[in-house]
Every structure is written in structure tokens, then in C-alpha cells.
Amino acid sequence: DIQMTQTPSSLSASLGDRVSISCRASQDLSQYLFWYQQKPGQPPKLLIYRVSRLTNGVPDRFSGSGSGTDFTLTIDPMEEDDTATYFCQQSRLIPRTFGGGTKLEIKR
């Protein structure tokens, strides 16, 4: 299985900050990297597919970058509604494994 290592596991940022979340795969993913946002009591929402392509309706404050084994989700600027847990997922090989998640909170 492909192992997905996501950092940091938790993050506190101020409104308006630029936030970056990293994901590293144990082998080359080509373009098969997705990012999800999950809020408490809700199913995960697909934000970004194929590394950098935004799903319809996702604001362009969100962006994805990277290639090969190293990928980044960036939120700029952070807004209150962005408080959630974020996951990367690879779809290069089955099983389609996830990173451990990053819980993003607002620094008050």
C-alpha cells in the first residue's frame, strides 16, 4: 500500500493568514492526489483533485501544488469557515489511502 504522511497533524492560524498543509507519499503518485475538507458531523467534501484542480464551488482561496511524492494544500487567506480537518488521498493505486489529517483551528 502507498503510505501517506500528512503534516502538521494540527494547526492554529489567525484569520487572514496563509496556511499550508503538506502531504508526502511513499511512492510517485503522478497526478493522482486529492484533498478533502471534513467538518464535524459531516462527510468529507472534495476540494481539489488531480493535485491542483478545484472542485466546482470551492473558493480560489484554496490551491494545491506539488508533484511526484510531495504535495501542498494552501489556504490564503484563511477564513472562519475554513475551520475543519483536511485530508490528502492518493488514487494512484488501490487501496486509495489517506493521510492522517490536519485539524485547522482559529488562533484567538
Swiss-Prot record:
Q: Give positions of region: Framework-4.
A: 98-108
Chain intervals for the UniProt region annotation (Framework-1): 1-23
Stretches for region Complementarity-determining-3: 89-97
- One GO cellular component from the entry? immunoglobulin complex
Which keywords label this protein? Answer: Adaptive immunity, Disulfide bond, Immunity, Immunoglobulin
Extract the PROSITE patterns matched here: IG_LIKE (PS50835)
Q: Where is this region: Complementarity-determining-1?
A: 24-34
Segments carrying the region annotation (Framework-3) are 57-88
Q: Which InterPro entries match?
A: Ig-like_dom, Ig-like_dom_sf, Ig-like_fold, Ig_sub, Ig_V-set, IgV_Light_Chain
Question: Which cysteine residues pair off into disulfide bonds?
Answer: C23-C88
- Tell me yes or no: is Zinc-finger among this UniProt entry's keywords: no
Query: Which SUPFAM superfamilies does the UniProt entry name for this protein?
Result: Immunoglobulin
Q: Give any single GO term for biological process.
A: adaptive immune response
Q: Where is this region: Complementarity-determining-2?
A: 50-56
Region (Framework-2), start-end ranges: 35-49
Q: What else is known?
A: The mixture sequenced contained at least two or three different light chains.
Q: Which PANTHER family match?
A: IMMUNOGLOBULIN LIGHT CHAIN
Name the UniProt record assigns to this protein: Ig kappa chain V-V regions
Q: Which organism is it from?
A: Mus musculus (Mouse)
